[in-house]
Every structure is written in structure tokens, then in C-alpha cells.
């Protein structure tokens, strides 16, 4: 059996980015509507517990072996290959590694389920409920690790766009299940069960999409040598997952263990709007990256360097434009959304935004390094930076009582080394010296700093009418749109060269054409 060879990487990248954007748009809308209901339905304490449980169980994904990541990037490099058996054996290897790690997941998960509630210093009446909810989330984790197999096949084959609209619909349905659980007053347990059902539906969806759209889909028993090779590769992806968990989930755990779950609630609600940046950029970048894998696999490093430049340029444009609007409007957004008492302040908002931007840039280069399948240096550097960040943040919060500001400063300082190490690693592989990277980033960085300083200052004293009705939301939306529009105009005309502006216009044109053809 021979497979058709994929040709138009730009079109697929555009469609993948669009599909990811639709998914994120659904998650954004669902989160925006459901979060206030969760805060009111669970209360400030249990909502904080729910957030910490979610972050803690995310750490357990490390124990699953992360074989699906190895599968995704292996297929990304082989997407032009017509060897069916080799691809099916890759799937078999991923499942074999998953089975090897299953006992570890159960063992470590059981320990977390039992001891986490007491570590949060919860009242005795909440201990049992929290343990049961944690157990449900452990089952969700196991189900999700299996659901990642068909998802990784789609993304590795650069066919993520084939689920366009379907996964967004499942996200909306999952939000509906959460609202139903709150309406029925099932509390923390009902919300946990709703999230489990959503994961099960998502897994079945991706499996059906793979069967329809991937001609070679199937599993072949791998050889012992292939399994060992996959296990070796998965080991580094596993460690990298741990690094990412330290970057993505350590903030809530530090505040939850060293401060209080109530402060976790305030921090997470203040962070909600800035965190949009990470997800939007991830939606764009993750849609482009598998296509970049095909370019790297073909040996065209010059073109790969050009695509990497586009990724960084688009990331900068997005976080500068939206970040300006967020700094100006976040205080009013939190006030209208969940109440002014849940706003952490202007300085924490600015620092959180900078933390999100730092994470975006680190993840961009980390994803490119993944495509080389040469992971040890990346993982070890990331582990050192992430652990250092957690230690510094924990000291500032636990010993000095610096709260949210101290925690974010600690994370920024600890991860700063990765902001230099990863670009150097990528530059060596693609032939882009660090000096030229710094030179290219200087003008955009200065422009972003100026816009952020201006909008953060204005955001301190700008206040809309004190009402919280629909009219207030419209005024806030107008203010945000006007800010984003002005920041976009300045960023596009001042921050980009003529060649970069042409490149973005070409990318947007390709996206529009791809979408119109799909319709």
C-alpha cells in the first residue's frame, strides 16, 4: 500500500491554525461563561481547591510516559513517507510504552489522591470530598492519555484541521455538562464527573476522525528494538512534560501550599485574561509546527529558519497587540466578570503578562527543538531553569511573604536563562547566530515596552461606569477593541519591516483562501 504525499504545507498550516483557533475560541467562550458560575457555585475555597487539583493531576501526566509526544513528532518527520507498516509500528510503540508506564500512573496517582487534601490544610469536612474528586481526575488523566494517541496521529500527519468544528462542539458540550452539574448542586464531585465525560467524548471523536481521514490508520506490534527506541525518546518527552508542568502549573501549587487556596482564586481570575495570550499563540504555532517538521525532515534548513522567523514574528504581533488591550482593560474586566475583590492589582497584572510572554517565546523554540528529535540538552536546560524558578518563587512567597508579586518575579528570574539558551540551540541548528536574533528582536522589543508602559499606566486610572450590566460590557468591549486596533496599527507599521508585513499579508491570504475552499 502506498500513501499520497502531502504537498501544500502552507495551506495545511493555515487550516491547522484555524482549527486550533476555533477550538480555543470555544474554550475561551465556555471558560468566560462557566467560570463565574463555578466561583459562585463552589465558593471561593472549593473553587481554589478545584484549580489546585487540576494542576496537581496535570503533574501526573509525567508518569504516563508521554509516548504520544514521541509519536506526534516521529510522524511529523515522516509525513512524506509512504511506509505504512513503519507508521503503524510507531503507533504500536506508543501504546506499548503507555502500558509500561500504567502501573506507575496508578501508584503515584494514588499517593497524590490521598495526601494532597491534607497538604492544602483543608477543614476535615472537605477532606473526603476532595479525595474522591482527585480520584475522578486521576481516571480522567488515564482516559486523556489514551485519547492523545489518535490526536497525535492527526497532528503528526499535519491533519489536525480535519477535526475542525467537531472538537469545539465537544468543548461547548462539556461546558454544558459543568453547568448542569452546578444546577443540580452536585458540587465538586459533579464538576469532576462532567470533566471526565468530556474527555471520554473527545477521545472517541478523535478516534473516529483518524479512521476516516488517515488511510494507514492501524496498529502493528512493534519489535523490542523499536519499543526501546521509542521508550528512550519518550523518556526525554516525559522529562520535558515535567518541565512544562513546572512552568505551567507550579504557580497555583506554590500559592496553594504556601499561602491559601483563596489567594489561588484571586490570582487565577486576574490571570485569566493575560493567559489568553498563551493559548492564542499556541493555537497558531502548534498549527504551523508539524509542517515545519516536514521541512526539517527534508533537510531544507534555510526554509525552516524562515518559518521559525514567521512564528516568532506572529507571536510578537499577537502578544503586543492583545497585551496592550489586556493591560488597559483587565481591572474592569475582572470587576464586571467576578467582582472587584478578585482583582490582584495593576503590578501583578503587568508581571503576569510578562510571564506569559516569556513562556510563549520559550515554548516556540522548545517546539522547534522537538522536531530535531535531539532532546537531552533542551530537557536538561529546561529542567534546571524550571526548578530554579520554582525554588526562587517558593522562597519569595514562603519566607518573605511576597505573595503574587514575589511568586511571579521568582518565576521570571528563574526561567530567564532559557530565554537565551533555547534561541542559541535553535540558532546553531538552523544557522542563525544569536547576534542576528538579538538585532532582529531589538526594535519589536522596544516598541512592546513602550506600548505596555503606556497602557499599564492608563489602566490604573481608567474606570468605566460603576454598573455591571450589559451596557458596561459594551463599553469595555469598545475600549478593548479601540486599544487593540491602535496597538495593531502601530505594531504593524512601526514594528515590522516591509518584508515582514508582506509575509503576514501572504499568510493571512493563504488562510482565507484555504478556509473559503473548505466552505
Identify what each model region corresponds to.
Residues 1-13, 206-249, 253, 287, ...:
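Interhelical loop/hinge segments that connect adjacent transmembrane helices in multipass membrane
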Residues 1-31, 85-96, 127-130, 206-210, ...:
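N-terminal membrane topogenesis motif
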Residues 1-7, 424-438, 453-519:
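Membrane-proximal transmembrane or re-entrant/amphipathic helices at the cytosolic face
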Residues 9, 13, 96-249, 457:
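Hydrophobic transmembrane helix module of multi-pass membrane transport proteins
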Residues 14, 141-166, 189, 353-387, ...:
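Membrane-interface junctions at transmembrane-helix termini in multi-pass inner-membrane proteins
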Residues 15-32, 170, 194-206, 210, ...:
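Transmembrane helical elements of multi-pass membrane transporters/channels
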Residues 37-46, 161, 172-204, 376, ...:
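Membrane-interface helix-loop junctions in multi-pass transport and translocation proteins
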Residues 65-81, 155-156, 214-216, 275-316, ...:
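Helix-loop junctions and terminal segments of transmembrane helices
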Amino acid at each position: 500500500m502506498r500513501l499520497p504525499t502531502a504537498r501544500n504545507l502552507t495551506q495545511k498550516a493555515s487550516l491547522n491554525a484555524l482549527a486550533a483557533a476555533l477550538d480555543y475560541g470555544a474554550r475561551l467562550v465556555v471558560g468566560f461563561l462557566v467560570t463565574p458560575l463555578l466561583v459562585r457555585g463552589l465558593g471561593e475555597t472549593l473553587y481554589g481547591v478545584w484549580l489546585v487539583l487540576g494542576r496537581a493531576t496535570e503533574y501526573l501526566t509525567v508518569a504516563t510516559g508521554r509516548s504520544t509526544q514521541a509519536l506526534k513528532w516521529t510522524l511529523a518527520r515522516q509525513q512524506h513517507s509512504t511506509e505504512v507498516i513503519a507508521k503503524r509500528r510507531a503507533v504500536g510503540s506508543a501504546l506499548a510504552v503507555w502500558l509500561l508506564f500504567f502501573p506507575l500512573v496508578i501508584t503515584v496517582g494514588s499517593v497524590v489522591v490521598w495526601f494532597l487534601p491534607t497538604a492544602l490544610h483543608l477543614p476535615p469536612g472537605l477532606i473526603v470530598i476532595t479525595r474522591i474528586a482527585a480520584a475522578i481526575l486521576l481516571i480522567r488523566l488515564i482516559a486523556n492519555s489514551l485519547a492523545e494517541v489518535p490526536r497525535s496521529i492527526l497532528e503528526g500527519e499535519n491533519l489536525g484541521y480535519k477535526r475542525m468544528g467537531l472538537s469545539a462542539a465537544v468543548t461547548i458540550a462539556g461546558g454544558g455538562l459543568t453547568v448542569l452539574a452546578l444546577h443540580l448542586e452536585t458540587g465538586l464531585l459533579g464538576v469532576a464527573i462532567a470533566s471526565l465525560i468530556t474527555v471520554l467524548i473527545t477521545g472517541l471523536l478523535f478516534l473516529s476522525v483518524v479512521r476516516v481521514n488517515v488511510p494507514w490508520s492501524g496498529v502493528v506490534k512493534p519489535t523490542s528494538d523499536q519499543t526501546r527506541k521509542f521508550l528512550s525518546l519518550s523518556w526525554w518527552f516525559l522529562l520535558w512534560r515535567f518541565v512544562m508542568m513546572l512552568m505551567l502549573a507550579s504557580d497555583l501549587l506554590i500559592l496553594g501550599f504556601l499561602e491559601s487556596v483563596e489567594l489561588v482564586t484571586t490570582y487565577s481570575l486576574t490571570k485569566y485574561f493575560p493567559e489568553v495570550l498563551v493559548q492564542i499563540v499556541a493555537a497558531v504555532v502548534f498549527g504551523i509546527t508539524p509542517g515545519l517538521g516536514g521541512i526539517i525532515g527534508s533537510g531544507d534548513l534555510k526554509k525552516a529558519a524562515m518559518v521559525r522567523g514567521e512564528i516568532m514574528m506572529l507571536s510578537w504581533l499577537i502578544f503586543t497587540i492583545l497585551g496592550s488591550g489586556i493591560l488597559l482593560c483587565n481591572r474592569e474586566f475582572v470587576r464586571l466578570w467576578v467582582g472587584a475583590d478578585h482583582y490582584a492589582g495593576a503590578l501583578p497584572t503587568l508581571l503576569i503578562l510578562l510571564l506569559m510572554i516569556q513562556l510563549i517565546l520559550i515554548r516556540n523554540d522548545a517546539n522547534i527543538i522537538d522536531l530535531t528529535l535531539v532532546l537531552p540538552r533542551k530537557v536538561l536546560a529546561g529542567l534546571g531553569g524550571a526548578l530554579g524558578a520554582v525554588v526562587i518563587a517558593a522562597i519569595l512567597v514562603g519566607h518573605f511573604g511576597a505573595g503574587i508579586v514575589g511568586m511571579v518575579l521568582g518565576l521570571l528570574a528563574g526561567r530567564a536563562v532559557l530565554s537565551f539558551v533555547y534561541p542559541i540551540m535553535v540558532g546553531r541548528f538552523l544557522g542563525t547566530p544569536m547576534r542576528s536574533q538579538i538585532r532582529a528582536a531589538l526594535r519589536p522589543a522596544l516598541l512592546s515596552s513602550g506600548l505596555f508602559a503606556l497602557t499599564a499606566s492608563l489602566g490604573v486610572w481608567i474606570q468605566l461606569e460603576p454598573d455591571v450590566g450589559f451596557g458596561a460590557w459594551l463599553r469595555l468591549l469598545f475600549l478593548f477593541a479601540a486599544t487593540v486596533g491602535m496597538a495593531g496599527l502601530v505594531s504593524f507599521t512601526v514594528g515590522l519591516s516591509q518584508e515582514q508585513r508582506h509575509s503576514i499579508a501572504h499568510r493571512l491570504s493563504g488562510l482565507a483562501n484555504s478556509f473559503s475552499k473548505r466552505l
